[in-house]
C-alpha cells in the first residue's frame, strides 16, 4: 500500500485519468522509459503527483534550473503535505571555479559563498532518504555532482535513544569527528553545547535544536526546541545526528588516501621532470605537499574536493557517488522539461573537464583532480531507474527511447484552449504592441515579450517605461532566486509586462498572462525553432483570452509547424469541450512560493531605496538613522541598526510575538550581508 497521501481539491479531469493509468501501468510493468507529452497548462505536475502516489515509490524530480525546481517543489508540497517533499539545488550563492589562463599566465583561485539555508535543505533531503520511504526530492542538475559516500555518511551518524546509557565524552568526540563545533554561547547549525546534564545540538538538516537531557549517564528525554525562544516543539524517542558535511572520511581511509596521493605526486613529478617542465613540477610539489600536511594535521585542506577520488577510495575514471546513490533500489526518476534537461547532462561533464585539463597540464592539480566531476551522461543513465520524461515538446532522443510509451495529454481540466496565434508585419510593430499592452493592462492582465537580443530587450523596456507602462526586464545576469521574485511580482500585479530573451519559455506557470509577443519570429535559429516557438506560445495557454502575437515579414517552416501544432491541439480541446458541455474557467493558482520565503534570499529592489518592510517591522528605529543621497542606509550606520534590531527581535521573542521576531531575524541577516559587501 502506498505511503503517499495526495491532497487536492479536485479530481483528475480531461485526459489526465487516461495518462495516469497508462503511466502507472508502465511503471508497474517495469517499462524503463515513458514520455508524457503534455501541452502547457494541462496539469502535468498533478498527473505525475498521482503517478507517484499510486506507485508508492521514492521519486527524484529533475528540473533544468532553480526557478523551475522551486515552483515544482512548492506545488508538490501542496499535493503531499504529510510526506517528505525535499528541495536539492546547488548551495552556492556565488561560485568562481579554480582556473588557469595560459595565454596571460593568470591563475584564478576558487572563491565561493555557501548559502546555509540551501545547505540545510540538501542535508534534509539525504536524511529523509535514509529514514523514510515516502520521499520526493525536487532537484536541479547539480544533483549529478559528487556527494560523499552514502554508506560512510550513514555509518558516521551519532544515535541517541531515550533510556539508553551513553558515554557523553565519546559522543562529543563523535560529533567533532563529524565536523560539528562546540560553542557554548552561539548555538546553531553544525554546532553543539553542553550545560550540566543537557546536550544541545544544531543538526545540519534542521533549523531546530535537538536537546538531549541526561540523568547521570542515561538519556532521560530527547526534544526539538526553538533556537531563539527555547520553547519545546516536539518530543522524540530516538534520533540520528548525521554529519555536518556530506563528505565523511574515516581515519583509516584518510591514512590510505594520503599514501595514494603521495604515490600519484611522485609519478606526476617524474613525468614533468622527464618532459622538462620544471616550473610545473615545482608548482605541483609545493601545492600538493602543503595540502598533504594540512590533511595530516586537521584532516582537511582548501580544495580538498580535488582529492575526492583518493579520499573515497575510488578507482581512476570511476563515477562519483551523488544524490542518486542515496536513493533505495526501487525509485522513480521524473525529468521535467526533458528536451532541455537531458541535454544539460552531457554539457555539465564536458565543461568541467576542459577546465580541469588545463589545471593538470600546468601543474596546479594532480591528474586525479579530473575525477572530482559530475556524472557523464551515460553514467547517469546507468544509475537511473525507471524514467518518465515530461515535456510539451520532447526531444527526438526521448521520443525514440520511449517508443510505444508516449502518452499525450492535451485537454486542460479548466477547459481553456490553446492560444489564438496571429502573425503581424514588423512595420509599426512597437506602436501596435503598445496598444495591445494598454488593452491588456486595462483588464488587469499580464504580457510577456520575447526578443532576440539583450540590446533589443533593454531598448524596448526603456521605450515602454517612457510610455508609462509598468515593465520589468528579465535577463541572464539576474540571480536565480531573484528571478523567482520577479515572476512573483508579475503575478501579483506589481507590473504588467515582462521582457526577456531566452528566459520566458519552459516551465513558467503564469495564469495571469493573456498575451505573449514574439518579435522577429521569422529569424530562424535556436530561439525561433519549432520547439522554442511552441513553448513560448504556451505561456499564454493558461488564460481564457490567451493570444500569441508573432511579428514577422516572412513565414518560416518553424512558424508553420508551431502554428499547425497549436491549432491541432486547440481543435482537440474545442471538440472535447463541446462534447462534454464544458465552459472554460480561469486557472486559480495562488501566487505564492514557500521555497522562496524559506530561503531568506529576497533581494527586492525598493523604489525609494529604503526597505519598506524594515520600516514597518522595526517601528521608529530606522528613522533615527541617517540616509545617504540615494535614500539608502549609510553603511556606517548599519552596525548600530543591527544592534537595535537584535534588541527588538529578542523583545518580540520574549513577548511571544514569534512572527515579528522571525521577520526581524530575516532583516538582520540581509543587513549583515550588506555590511560584508
Curated annotation (Swiss-Prot):
Family, similarity comment: Belongs to the UvrB family.
InterPro entries recorded: Helicase/UvrB_N (IPR006935), Helicase_ATP-bd (IPR014001), Helicase_C-like (IPR001650), P-loop_NTPase (IPR027417), UVR_dom (IPR001943), UVR_dom_sf (IPR036876), UvrB (IPR004807), UvrB_inter (IPR041471)
Disulfide-linked positions: none
Name under which the protein is recorded: UvrABC system protein B
Gene from which the chain derives: uvrB
Motif Beta-hairpin location, chain numbering: 91-114
Assigned keywords, A-Z: ATP-binding, Cytoplasm, DNA damage, DNA excision, DNA repair, Excision nuclease, Nucleotide-binding, SOS response
Organism: Prochlorococcus marinus (strain SARG / CCMP1375 / SS120)
GO terms for MF: ATP binding; ATP hydrolysis activity; DNA binding; excinuclease ABC activity
Record comment regarding domains: The beta-hairpin motif is involved in DNA binding.
Amino acid at each position: 500500500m502506498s505511503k503517499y497521501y495526495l491532497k487536492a481539491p479536485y479530481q483528475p479531469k480531461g485526459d489526465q485519468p487516461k495518462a495516469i493509468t497508462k503511466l502507472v501501468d508502465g511503471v508497474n510493468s517495469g517499462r524503463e522509459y515513458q514520455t508524457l507529452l503534455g501541452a502547457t497548462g494541462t496539469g502535468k505536475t498533478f498527473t505525475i503527483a498521482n503517478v507517484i502516489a499510486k506507485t508508492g515509490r521514492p521519486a527524484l524530480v529533475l528540473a533544468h534550473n532553480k526557478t523551475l525546481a522551486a515552483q515544482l517543489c512548492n506545488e508538490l508540497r501542496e499535493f503531499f503535505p504529510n510526506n517528505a517533499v525535499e528541495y536539492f539545488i546547488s548551495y552556492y550563492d556565488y561560485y568562481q571555479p579554480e582556473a588557469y589562463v595560459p595565454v596571460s599566465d593568470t591563475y584564478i583561485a576558487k572563491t565561493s559563498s555557501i548559502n546555509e539555508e540551501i545547505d540545510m535543505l540538501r542535508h534534509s533531503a539525504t536524511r529523509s532518504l535514509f529514514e523514510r520511504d515516502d520521499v520526493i526530492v525536487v532537484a536541479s542538475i547539480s544533483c549529478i555532482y559528487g556527494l560523499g559516500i552514502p554508506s560512510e555518511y550513514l555509518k558516521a551518524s551519532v544515535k541517541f535513544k531515550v533510556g539508553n546509557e551513553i558515554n557523553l565524552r565519546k559522543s562529543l568526540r563523535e560529533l567533532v569527528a563529524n565536523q560539528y563545533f562546540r560553542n557554548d554561547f552561539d548555538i546553531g547549525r553544525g554546532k553543539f553545547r553542553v550545560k550540566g546534564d543537557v546536550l544541545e545540538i544544531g543538526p545540519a538538516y534542521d533549523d531546530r535544536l535537538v536537546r538531549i537531557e541526561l540523568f547521570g549517564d542515561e538519556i532521560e528525554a530527547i526534544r526539538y526546541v526553538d533556537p531563539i525562544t527555547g520553547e519545546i516543539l516536539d518530543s522524540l524517542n530516538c534520533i540520528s545526528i548525521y554529519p555536518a558535511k556530506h563528505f565523511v572520511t574515516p581515519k583509516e581511509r584518510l591514512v590510505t588516501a594520503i599514501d595514494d596521493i603521495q604515490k600519484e605526486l611522485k609519478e606526476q613529478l617524474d613525468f614533468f621532470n622527464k618532459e622538462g617542465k620544471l616550473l610545473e613540477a615545482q608548482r605541483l610539489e609545493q601545492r600538493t605537499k602543503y595540502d598533504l600536511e594540512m590533511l595530516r594535521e586537521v584532516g582537511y585542506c582548501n580544495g580538498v574536493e580535488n582529492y575526492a577520488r583518493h579520499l573515497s577510495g575510488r578507482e581512476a575514471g570511476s563515477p562519483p557517488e551523488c544524490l542518486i546513490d542515496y536513493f533505495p533500489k526501487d525509485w522513480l526518476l521524473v525529468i521535467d522539461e526533458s528536451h532541455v534537461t537531458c541535454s544539460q547532462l552531457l554539457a555539465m561533464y564536458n565543461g568541467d573537464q576542459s577546465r580541469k585539463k588545463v589545471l593538470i597540464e600546468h601543474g596546479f592539480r594532480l591528474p586525479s583532480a579530473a575525477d572530482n566531476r559530475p556524472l557523464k551522461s551515460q553514467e547517469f543513465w546507468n544509475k537511473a531507474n525507471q524514467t518518465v520524461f515530461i515535456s510539451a515538446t520532447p526531444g527526438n532522443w526521448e521520443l525514440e527511447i520511449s517508443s510505444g510509451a508516449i502518452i499525450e495529454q492535451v485537454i486542460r481540466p479548466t477547459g481553456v484552449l490553446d492560444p489564438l496565434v496571429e502573425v503581424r508585419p514588423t512595420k509599426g510593430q512597437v506602436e501596435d504592441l503598445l496598444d495591445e499592452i494598454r488593452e491588456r493592462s486595462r483588464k488587469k492582465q499580464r504580457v510577456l515579450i520575447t526578443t532576440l537580443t539583450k540590446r533589443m530587450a533593454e531598448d524596448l523596456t526603456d521605450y515602454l517605461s517612457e510610455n508609462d507602462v509598468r515593465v520589468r526586464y528579465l535577463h541572464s545576469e539576474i540571480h536565480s532566486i531573484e528571478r523567482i521574485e520577479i515572476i512573483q511580482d508579475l503575478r501579483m500585479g506589481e507590473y504588467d509586462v515582462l521582457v526577456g530573451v531566452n528566459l520566458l519559455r519552459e516551465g513558467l506557470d503564469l495564469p495571469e498572462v493573456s498575451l505573449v509577443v514574439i518579435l522577429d519570429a521569422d529569424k530562424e535559429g535556436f530561439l525561433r525553432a519549432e520547439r522554442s516557438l511552441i513553448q513560448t506560445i504556451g505561456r499564454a495557454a493558461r488564460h481564457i483570452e490567451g493570444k500569441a502575437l508573432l511579428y514577422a515579414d516572412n513565414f518560416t517552416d518553424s512558424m508553420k509547424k508551431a502554428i499547425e501544432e497549436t491549432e491541432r491541439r486547440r481543435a482537440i480541446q474545442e471538440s472535447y469541450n463541446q462534447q462534454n458541455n464544458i465552459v472554460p474557467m480561469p486557472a486559480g493558482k495562488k501566487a505564492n512560493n514557500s521555497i522562496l520565503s524559506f530561503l531568506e534570499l529576497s533581494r527586492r529592489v525598493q523604489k525609494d531605496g529604503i526597505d519598506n518592510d524594515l520600516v514597518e517591522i522595526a517601528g521608529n528605529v530606522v528613522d533615527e538613522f541617517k540616509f545617504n543621497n540615494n535614500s539608502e542606509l549609510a553603511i556606517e550606520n548599519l552596525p548600530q541598526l543591527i544592534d537595535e534590531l537584535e534588541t527588538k527581535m529578542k523583545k518580540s521573542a520574549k513577548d511571544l510575538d514569534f512572527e515579528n521576531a522571525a521577520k526581524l531575524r530575516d532583516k538582520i541577516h540581509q543587513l549583515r550581508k550588506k555590511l560584508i559587501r
